[in-house]
Design a protein with these regions (language model features):
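Bacterial N-terminal signal peptides that target proteins for export
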Residues: 1-5
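Short, surface-exposed linear segments at secondary-structure transitions and domain or protein termini
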Residues: 185-195
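C-terminal motif of bacterial Sec signal peptides marking the signal peptidase cleavage site
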Residues: 12-15
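Short aromatic loop motif centered on NTY/YTY
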Residues: 157-187
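Short helix/turn-capping signatures at newly exposed starts of structured segments
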Residues: 17-161, 193-226
Length: 226
């Protein structure tokens, strides 16, 4: 019995012993705030895949407006005053160019056009599949993907001589034309290109929709264009 009592006392005493390190060791060392300001990130030109296409324009570009010119290293559209200087048929020695390299398709990611000598944008045509609409549509999207992306329908629908169908999405100052290859002329399109988006174009809201496939409207971005 005495052994049991002695054992109990040992347990109680050991349970009441202070835990090593439990006592405060003194005032904590004060932290020293850094006076070095957080560096501001340098502005950069958006990547092609970050340019959002809308019925009114592309990124900072808007149809009906003059392209913003802030910094040639940052602007997505820049003016080259001598780009067409050595081409006799050119309507002007200079041209506005997408500020990105030419891609494997032979085009820059997009092109912009000005009509009738105006200094405001009237056409923005997309040539890169990396550029997408807010709903995810891009060059190469299927017709089914397009119809699912716009369940409420389109402002208009145009049959382009059976070669393609042009769907119009209305904006405020502009409209987005989404051209989809069609099978109205059997054999015109390779099987893997049929029923797919083959051109995305932004034009002013008061312009009439049109089709490009099978026509000669690819003059946009060329020195001999209007």
């Amino acid at each position: 019995m005495l052994g049991v009592i002695a054992f109990a006392l040992v347990v109680v005493i050991s349970g009441c012993a202070p835990v090593p390190g439990g006592e405060p060791s003194g005032d904590p060392t004060p932290s020293i705030a850094s006076d070095t300001p957080t560096p501001t990130p340098e502005p950069t030109k958006p990547a092609v895949a970050d340019l959002l296409l809308s019925p009114d324009g592309l990124g900072p570009l808007r149809v009906g407006e003059t392209p913003p010119a802030t910094d040639p290293a940052l602007d997505i559209l820049v003016y080259d005053p001598d780009y067409c200087a050595e081409i006799p048929e050119a309507s002007s020695p200079g041209m506005w160019l997408a500020n990105y390299p030419v891609e494997a398709s032979g085009h820059r990611p997009f092109t912009a056009a000005f009509r009738n000598g105006a200094d405001t944008l009237s056409v923005i045509a997309i040539f890169s599949p990396e550029i997408r609409t807010e709903t995810g549509i891009h060059l190469g999207s299927t017709k089914d993907e397009l119809l699912a992306a716009y369940p409420e329908g389109f402002a208009s629908k145009l049959d382009n001589h059976g070669v393609s169908t042009v769907y119009s999405v209305a904006g405020t100052a502009g409209q987005l034309l989404i051209e989809v290859t069609a099978d109205g002329m059997p054999g015109y399109w390779p099987a893997d290109e049929l029923n797919r988006v083959n051109l995305l174009t932004v034009i002013p809201a008061d312009s009439n929709p049109f089709g490009v496939a099978g026509g000669d409207a690819y003059f946009w971005g060329e020195c001999t264009g209007p």
